[in-house]
């Protein structure tokens, strides 16, 4: 394995289109989620492109145990990581479509800026969490569907 990752990890995909900030859950909440997963024995792996470096770095600072793979993964590597992960959590963004298709547990966060019925990720183990304002989705609600 190129990244030498631990056996038990969760993928976090906190980015999204720069021109659509309403599709992004807050870095503070991703940081808290990452810390909680780590306490439970799941190492958070952060995925995103170079344009999301600042977001991933902030989460890394707030959860130093997270492994930041910003800009280091190809689509094939993302699919491979998703297959190995216990769970993936992310915003409505391109990589989450690929991750969902792999077939592992996937939680995708939505506000009202897009509709999962029309453009949602598809796969056998996909859960959508949606609030009119994505910022109103709580860490607790993400955790609840993550362990269901």
Model-predicted segments: where are they?
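Nucleotide-sugar donor-binding patch of glycosyltransferase catalytic domains
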Residues: 61, 68-69, 97-148
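Charged active-site motifs of nucleotide-sugar-dependent glycosyltransferases
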Residues: 3-13, 42-45
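Donor-binding and catalytic core of enzymes assembling or modifying cell-surface/extracellular glycoconjugates
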Residues: 27-107, 111-114
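Glycine/threonine-rich flexible loop motifs
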Residues: 19-26
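CheY-like receiver
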Residues: 2-3, 33, 81, 145
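A nucleotide-sugar donor-handling region in carbohydrate enzymes
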Residues: 1-9, 20, 137
